[in-house]
């Protein structure tokens, strides 16, 4: 619970420093965004960057691996988070070649996230709002 509250506090502090300008990323599916201002804020500070095709896809589910990346971007900032890497596989189903392995390894080391009893993490598994 302490780590979660620390994460919320860090996010609150970061967002209080942000001003949105005309340079906020425009997603190809902006008209589908119910919370466009919030999406503008988190994309402006590079917490999320959308998909390669330029869309945000608000209807898609969030995977456990992508959640680890978002958490690292919030805590470390996107530049430092992008430099994270895993020297060894953090979980039996997360090889070092996995896109999210560095983020998952960092979050696991810091006690922010955990895997399953069988030693897996299931990075492609989806999260509910409650779990995140």
Where are these regions (language model features)?
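Mature N-terminal segment immediately following signal peptide/propeptide cleavage
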Residues: 40-47
């Amino acid at each position: 619970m302490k780590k979660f509250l620390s994460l919320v506090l860090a996010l609150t502090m970061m967002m209080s420093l942000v001003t949105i300008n005309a340079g906020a990323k425009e997603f190809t599916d902006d008209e589908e965004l119910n919370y466009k201002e919030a999406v503008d804020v988190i994309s402006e500070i590079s917490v999320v960057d959308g998909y390669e095709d330029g869309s945000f896809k608000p209807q898609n589910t969030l995977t456990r691996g992508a959640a680890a990346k978002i958490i690292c971007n919030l805590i470390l900032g996107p530049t430092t988070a992008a430099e994270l890497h895993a020297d060894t596989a953090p979980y039996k189903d997360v090889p070092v070649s996995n896109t999210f392995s560095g983020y998952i390894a960092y979050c696991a080391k810091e006690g922010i996230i955990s895997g399953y009893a069988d030693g897996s993490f299931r990075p492609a598994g989806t999260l509910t709002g409650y779990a995140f």
